[in-house]
Amino acid sequence: MAELSDQEMLRYNRQIILRGFDFEGQEALKDARVLVVGLGGLGCAATQYLAGAGVGQLTLLDFDTVSVSNLQRQTLHSDATVGQPKVESARDALARINPHITITPVNARLDDDAMTSLIAGHSLVLDCTDNVSVRNQLNAGCYTAKVPLISGAAIRMEGQVTVFTYRENEPCYRCLSRLFGENALTCVEAGVMAPLIGVIGSLQAMEAIKLLAHYGQPASGKIVMYDAMTCQFREMKLMRNPGCEVCGQ
């Protein structure tokens, strides 16, 4: 396991002193390789905290460019980066947050084989997209590679987070997505409140840190839902579907 430098020990001191986290937890983060797919609102929120917390290697995957309409909620981007690839804008912002980590941008749309190959080289994947077909592609690749997937979604004033670890008898994302099909609304169509994006992206980062450092209980086997209108959280148990095309028998 990678050792922490003196500068890193100072930087991450508030995490290291947490009961049960210690140097081992911080070194596990430094060793980790996390793939973040989608550098919109959720991806911007999640990666800020993953970078700040000391995740050693972040791979940023997106094929979109920054537009003015993104700036309300996509906090790594700015007026100065409008027109740039999102992964490059995000990389530069994250490098300013933490110069001790490695950030690799991938400005591309990948086919299934390339996606699965990329996933297999990582410790964990964050799904920060707003596209059901891409979400299903990520789920299939993560299931094949047995790499945990943390899925987040936010629209209007509601958001949700789910962790998929692909252990025996646990559900996968397709068990969920087959319930509502391919025609889920997006933020472009329905709108979204900016701070809600920050809440859900931060929850994704927290779940990632817990998984990587074996710290706490991950939100697997359930959907954690947040209603920003009433400031209430609730959970719904997610069952594995025997007829699922990905994880079913």
Curated annotation (Swiss-Prot):
Cofactor(s) demanded: Zn(2+)
Top-level taxon of origin: Bacteria
UniProt key word Zinc: yes
Residues annotated to bind ATP: 41, 62, 69-73, 86, 130-131
Cofactor info, note text: Binds 1 zinc ion per subunit.
GO molecular function, one term: metal ion binding
Reaction(s) catalysed by this chain's protein: [molybdopterin-synthase sulfur-carrier protein]-C-terminal Gly-Gly + ATP + H(+) = [molybdopterin-synthase sulfur-carrier protein]-C-terminal Gly-Gly-AMP + diphosphate
InterPro entries for the chain: Mopterin_Synthase_Sase_MoeB (IPR012730), ThiF/MoeB/HesA (IPR045886), ThiF_NAD_FAD-bd (IPR000594), Ubiquitin-activating_enz (IPR035985)
Matching Gene3D superfamilies: NAD(P)-binding Rossmann-like Domain
UniProt record, GO biological process: Mo-molybdopterin cofactor biosynthetic process
GO CC, alphabetical: cytoplasm; cytosol
Function statement: Catalyzes the adenylation by ATP of the carboxyl group of the C-terminal glycine of sulfur carrier protein MoaD.
Name of the protein in question: Molybdopterin-synthase adenylyltransferase
